């Protein structure tokens, strides 16, 4: 029986792709680079913001210094506009409430920066629906590496054989 459900954030709980694409395209336009469709951005996401920035940056703009500058541009723009179009997927708040009513622990584990995750969750889902919210933190590899997931399960006292992860 499942006793704990861990959720990814972007693309699982929240439809964030439009705000991610808008921020990415703004950075591209500011730098005179080609822009992309939302469908193209969907193919670029899934391994954290630094990897997304690398993927939309032209090959000749991928030195470590250039990527750091582009990441700073993207982060500033996204932080200012991360709630413009983002919304929970239909049925997600009701699902979370049903899981909690059954006594199932719920937590978030995302490749999005840890500093952003708590505020985003509070904004869209309030408090009390999640037992823990964890984003990308220094020293913890991003998904698909399972290190952070195992650490979160340990923190929650969750049995891995009774835990479900939803997302990528």
Question: What residue ranges belong to the model's regions?
Answer:
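Active-site neighborhood of HAD-like aspartate-dependent phosphohydrolases
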Residues: 1-43, 57
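Helix-loop "lid/cap" segments that line or gate small-molecule binding pockets
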Residues: 27-28, 48-63, 120-123, 152-153
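An amphipathic alpha-helix signature
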Residues: 21, 25, 38, 42, ...
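Substrate-recognition "cap/lid" segment bordering the active-site pocket of phosphatases
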Residues: 84-87, 113-166
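Helix N-cap/coil-helix junction residues
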Residues: 33, 59-62, 126-127, 158
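Substrate-recognition element of Asp-dependent hydrolases with the DxDx(T/V) motif
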Residues: 24, 92-122
């Amino acid at each position: 029986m499942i006793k704990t459900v861990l959720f990814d954030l972007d693309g699982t709980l929240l439809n964030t792709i439009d705000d991610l694409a808008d921020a990415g395209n703004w950075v591209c336009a500011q730098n005179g680079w080609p822009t992309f469709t939302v469908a193209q951005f969907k193919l670029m996401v899934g391994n954290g913001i630094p990897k997304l920035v690398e993927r939309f940056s032209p090959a000749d703009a991928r030195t470590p210094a250039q990527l750091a500058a582009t990441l700073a541009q993207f982060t500033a723009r996204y932080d200012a506009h991360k709630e413009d179009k983002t919304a929970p997927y239909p049925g997600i708040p009701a699902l979370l409430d049903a899981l909690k009513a059954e006594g199932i622990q719920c937590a978030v584990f995302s490749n999005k920066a840890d500093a952003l995750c708590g505020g985003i969750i509070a904004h869209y889902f309030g408090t009390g629906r999640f037992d823990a919210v964890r984003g990308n933190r220094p020293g913890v590899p991003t998904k698909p590496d399972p290190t952070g997931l195992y650490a979160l399960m340990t923190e929650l006292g969750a049995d891995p054989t009774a835990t479900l992860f939803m997302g990528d």
